[in-house]
Amino acid sequence: MKKVIFLIYVSLFIFNWGKAWALIEVDITRGNLNPLPLAVSPLSVDQNSKEKFKNLLKLEDIGVEISKVVENNLRQSGLFNPLDPKAFLQKPDIAHVKPRFEDWALIKAQALITGEVKIVDEKLRVEFRLWDILAGKEIMALAFTTVSENWRRVGHIITDK
């Protein structure tokens, strides 16, 4: 009887030995992350500031240029899918104050970046806001003041925030 019990223990040990040392192998073939669709509205610029920037920096519309920097940075990250500005239903100067969330939801945007550019004491002042379209509320608002030549850097800083 002792031999039978011993053989049962030995056989259980031998047959389970391989399972105890088995390695789990997982193959990850692709990610499951869809880029977030967001709208980067051109930053609004009042006419007086637009003329000053045009003379100072030789740019037609500094608000559009800063928005392009932000849009390109977000696209290159792979985490965001900036929507085509031609699809936007709301004008940038109105969207900055209070976006019509229904309009942005129609074009499938889940987030919105708006802003305003102006000259204050001969310096560039950029205000930007990040909006959650689905929740219908502002997530973040920041303002930067710098020399006009740093306009591109401001676009990169907005992206980093």
Predicted regions and their residues:
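Sec-dependent N-terminal signal peptides
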Residues: V4-I14
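Hydrophobic/anchoring residues in structured secondary elements
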Residues: F6, V45, T114-V117
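Structured helix-beta-strand junction loops
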Residues: L7, S77, I107-K108
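Sec/Tat signal peptide C-region and signal peptidase I cleavage site
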Residues: N16-A22
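Envelope-exposed proteins and targeting segments
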Residues: A22-I24, N34-A39, I66, V70, ...
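Amphipathic beta-strand/beta-sheet edge segments enriched in Tyr/Trp
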Residues: I24, A95-I157
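Short beta-strand->alpha-helix linker/helix-N-cap micro-motif
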Residues: T29-R100
